[in-house]
Every structure is written in structure tokens, then in C-alpha cells.
Amino acid sequence: MAAIKIANPGAEVTRSQAALAVNICAARGLQDVLRPTLGPKGALKMLVSGAGDIKLTKDGNVLLHEMQIQHPTASIIAKVAAAQDHVTGDGTTSNVLIIGELLKQADLYISEGLHPRIITEGFDVAKTKALEVLDEIKVQKEMKREILLDVARTSLQTKVHAELADILTEAVVDSVLAIRRPGVPIDLFMVEIVEMRHKSETDTQLIRGLVLDHGARHPRMRKQVRDAYILTCNVSLEYEKTEVSSGFFYKTVEEKEKLVKAERKFIEDRVQKIIDLKQKVCAESNKGFVVINQKGIDPVSLEMLAKHNIVALRRAKRRNLERLTLACGGLAVNSFEGLSEECLGHAGLVFEYALGEEKFTFIEDCVNPLSVTLLVKGPNKHTLIQIKDALRDGLRAVKNAIEDGCVVPGAGAVEVAIAEALVNYKHRVQGRVRLGIQAFADALLIIPKVLAQNSGYDLQETLIKIQTKHAESKELLGIDLNTGEPMAAAEAGIWDNYCVKKHLLHSCTVIATNILLVDEIMRAGMSSLRD
């Protein structure tokens, strides 16, 4: 009897081989769900929520977040894969597939009597060697636009169809290059992704400026301003209650009127400072003037600004204030004391676009903007969500390539090369540990196998072709998914991120090792006691 049964007779216990079988079964089950989604030719999954909302996706990270996974082992694997996406932005599906395959290959040896500890030691040796091989085959490149286009296209084609991927590729690369500054880490939050349910997904475009999801609040304000000064501020232009508990008291009507006039004058003085600055900078030109405020602007203030041809937007999102100053220049001011021309940014064109009841304000033609906007268009909600998920992965792929300073060939070439290196290396290792190395090598081949299978080719035949040609030529060969034949991935411009592959090898080995060493599963928490 298990020791926990003595302390808690109601506990559920699974031991030894049964525990291992349960864990491997859970990992294989999760692998089977994600297996058909790998690669550019992968299948889509339709997710239907409890409320009836539909989401079509083949993004592993989205699937793992949206699915309700109850099995504890499958849940652990899902969290590890989701962490992979959080750290590197890609490799979620590959993570689940390799973990499942590592456990499957280990199970073959364990069923013949090999102890799990021996297998895990082999996995650790194999991981160390695999990382050495990965460092040898990585390609150091100057990250020019052409290479980044290939990296982005490789990532995006696994998320959306090829025609759309080609359109998104240029937008993604140009947006990262726009916000890139020498010696400063790339901040992808400076790329705003804005949805517009309009036209088709192929109309998605890069705006070298900002798109705000609201418009001006006064009918007399101009809908289009060219060559405009931009004042970004966080100053209230309406009467607000005090932040502390306080009040003003009056005894007569005259005193009340004085209070009202004083409150009004307080706001009007602030508005007048904006008007004075506008008249100063635009006195001898036809330049426009736009005020974008995080706080409110009351109707009287809007009327004053409209009379002087000033376009004013209120209640702008806080995150857009930083983006505005980076895109247009100038400073975000919290007070109108000492307001000067140095505080102003500039945009070549500011215009309002109405789409049904929604309004959008475009701020374009900025000089060297350090913040840009990806305007996602599509006919329906699930298309917009799918494109947004793809764009995030594409942006991360380009960022990773720039920060790594190197790339690795894709299309399964890395896995084939590492697997062959491990098979050759195992003969230099003494004892049964070499069986763990062989299991690791076989598990990595799940990636080229599934890529071939999802493209409609025989997985074993395709793999043998690649391995044979790789052994002869020593080139890094992947699978041409259009023909099923071996191809030089580097020549075809198919590049993966080095950091994704490195993180993948680390995380897969660690989680597979931990699962193999579980010999008892106990469900004896407070919730099961109450049950």
C-alpha cells in the first residue's frame, strides 16, 4: 500500500509503470492535437467558445491558451510551450511535438527494461552535443533587409496563407527597421497594431505614423490638416472635481456666479495659452495645429479651439502619448506653463476617416518616425484576430534575428543535421547512455516527418531522401514542401531564429526528463478530500 493511502485513504495514487504510461499518453494526446498544424501546409483548427465565438487558427500558442486542458501532465507541457512563445515568440507547436516524441522514444526502451534514469542521462548528453552542433551550423549574417524579409516570410507562412504572408512580410520588416535605434533594445510596443473591419485582409498596411481609434469632438473642426504642428499633452481642459475631499461653499447667488466664472476662467486661461502658441508658430504660414490630449476637453473649450482652426482630440490612450512623441517629435507636456515651440511635434498629414459609426484619426508623413502603426484590415472578426496573431509572431522573428546576429536554415534542415551528428557521436559514448542519445536523435526527426506528412508526402520516404543526400553532400538540407524533394534551405531563403531552436532544445529536454522521472502521481489535495 502507498504511504499516502495510510495518511489519506481517499487519495488517488498511480505508481511506477502506470504513472509513466499515464504521463506519456497525455503528452502523446497533446502532440496529436497540434501535429496537423505544423508548417506552412498545416491544417487550421476551429475553436468554438462557450458563448459560440469561433476562432480559426493554426498558431500553437493560441490553441494552447484557448483549449481547456485538464490533465496535469498535458497542462505542464502546454505551459512550457506557452513560455517558449513568451520568451522567443515562436516554436510552440515544435515544442509540444518534440516533448511527445522524446517520451515516445524513451517508452520503447523503458518497455524493454531500461531504467528511465539512464534515458534521461542520455538526453542530457545529447542536448549538450545538439547545442554544440547548433552553434556550428548557425549562419552569421549582416541583418540587411533582404535577410529579414526571408526570416519574416518563413515565420508568417506558417500562420497565414502564402499570398497574405508576402504582403505582411514587407510591413513587418519595415516597421521593425523604422523603430530600430543603434545601441538601444528594440521595443515592439512602439509598433501599434490597429484593427479596421473594412475591405479585405490583403489591404493590411504599414502607416509611418499613428492611427488613433477616435476622432475630433466638434463638428466645425477640420477633417484634414496638412503640414501640422502636433501638441501632445496630459492636461485637463474641463472642470474636474478635486482629488481630495474638499468643497466650495457660498451664501448668495452672486457668490455662486463668481465661483462659476472663476472655474471657467481657470480653464479658458489654459485654452488661451494653446491659442497663443498656435498664433505664434503659424502667424506667417498656413500650417495646421493639432492638439491631442489624454484628459478631457469640455464643449466650451472645443468651441474656442475650433474658432482658431485648431483640431483637438481628447481622451487619447496613455500608451499613445509616448508613441506620438516618438513618431512626430516634440514633448508630452503635463502643464502649459512655459509652453513653447520646442514642445511641438510635426506631421505632414492629419486626417479623420469615418467607417460607419467608428472614427479613426491618421497621423502620417512623419519624419523618421520611431513609432509606427500596422493597420490590420479584414472582412470579419476572426480574420482580424488571425492576422494580429501572425503579425506579433512575425515582429518577434525579425527582432530575434537582429538581436542574435545569426540565423539557422529552416524546413527541418537543423533537426536532420543534429540527428545525424548525434548518431555519429553516440559511438564515442560508453555504456547504455548511448541509447538515450539515439532516442533523442530519433525524436528530433519528428519535425521533418510532420512537415512532409502535412504537405501530403510519405514521411518515411521523404526523410530517407533527405538523410541520404545530406550524408553524401553534407549540405544543410530541408524539405521542399511543394515537391517533397530535398532542398538547400539557405538557398531558398528559409531561415529560422537561432534563439528559438536553442530554447527549444533546452526546454524540451528538461520537461521530458522531469516527466520520465515521475514514478508516482498522487491526488490528495484539499479539493479531493472535500470531494
UniProtKB/Swiss-Prot annotation:
The keyword Nucleotide-binding applies. One of its GO terms (cellular component) is chaperonin-containing T-complex. It comes from the Eukaryota. One of its GO terms (molecular function) is ATP-dependent protein folding chaperone. Transmembrane segments: none annotated. Coiled coil: none annotated. The keyword Cytoplasm applies. PROSITE patterns: TCP1_2 (PS00751), TCP1_3 (PS00995). Belongs to the TCP-1 chaperonin family. NCBIfam families: chap_CCT_zeta (TIGR02347), thermosome_beta (NF041083). Component of the chaperonin-containing T-complex (TRiC), a molecular chaperone complex that assists the folding of proteins upon ATP hydrolysis. This is T-complex protein 1 subunit zeta-2. The gene is Cct6b.
